[in-house]
Amino acid sequence: MSAEVETSEGVDESEKKNSGALEKENQMRMADLSELLKEGTKEAHDRAENTQFVKDFLKGNIKKELFKLATTALYFTYSALEEEMERNKDHPTFAPLYFPMELHRKEALTKDMEYFFGENWEEQVQCPKAAKKYVERIHYIGQNEPELLVAHAYTRYMGDLSGGQVLKKVAQRALKLPSTGEGTQFYLFENVDNAQQFKQLYRARMNALDLNMKTKERIVEEANKAFEYNMQIFNELDQAGSTLARETLEDGFPVHDGKGDMRKCPFYAGEQDKGALEGSSCPFRTAMAVLRKPSLQFILAAGMALAAGLLAWYYM
């Protein structure tokens, strides 16, 4: 009997040790910055995943003009990010993650801007208002809290290496862009031979940063702020779209141009059988008028650009 008790106790003790070692290993793994970011931004991912803008992008429901404006927003965003990365390339909390040859996107985006807007593209564009807050935040972090810069770099570049490749194919197919890469240079990482291996290297470097738990928590918080900026931009997009639609109607923009058979208008064709024509306005004409508004174009651009960033997270 006593021998059985001792054996049982011995097994129990061994199990306790194994359980303790496993728990410690899990705690260490969960303390890795990459794991903390993954777990700590799940809720933000879920909110973004249900955004109609994101769903439409995946379906290829994008217009070339909006894609051009999205490229504009990306150009200003990455210009700010890479300026601050250059400023902090020797900072101990960021230096191991400084990969200008492999990751930097400004030069690629410059090529895309030239493709879409021509050689004098710099005279034609300005930083979209909707993207300005995020640009300002990046500059603030780079100049005042560089230890948090990793939140923005990791969110952007790791996503670009993942879902960005899916977005490239969607854009090329939907917009009939050249398969040789014109207009989508942003998604081409010429100096990264194996994206999966590079992402593993980047995460390992990030996890090896000498950061205490409080700083890691602040980095996760900063990553969530980036997602919040995205959500705010989508909300602004919806509000601006509604406001400008009202302005268009108040300005007396014609509901239908009166040329040809009115029944061929997709809106009227769908509503005719319902007896709902009276008092209705055609959203297709309204949408075209709204999209001609420069202010809304830039809001849509920022929304498209940040949607691309959100989508990229889904494939990491």
From Swiss-Prot:
Cellular-component GO terms for this entry: endoplasmic reticulum
Feature: compositional bias, Acidic residues: 1-12
Post-translational modification as stated in the protein's UniProt record: S-nitrosylated by BLVRB.
Family annotation (SUPFAM superfamilies): Heme oxygenase-like
Repeat positions for HRM: 264-269, 281-286
Positions where N-acetylserine occurs in the chain: S2
Protein EC: 1.14.14.18
Localization per record: Microsome; Endoplasmic reticulum
Alphabetized InterPro entries for the sequence: Haem_Oase (IPR002051), Haem_Oase-like (IPR016053), Haem_Oase-like_multi-hlx (IPR016084), Haem_oxygenase_CS (IPR018207)
Main location class: other
Residues where S-nitrosocysteine is found: C265, C282
Reactions catalysed, as given in the entry: heme b + 3 reduced [NADPH--hemoprotein reductase] + 3 O2 = biliverdin IXalpha + CO + Fe(2+) + 3 oxidized [NADPH--hemoprotein reductase] + 3 H2O + H(+)
Keyword Hydrolase listed: no
UniProt protein name: Heme oxygenase 2
UniProt organism field: Macaca fascicularis (Crab-eating macaque)
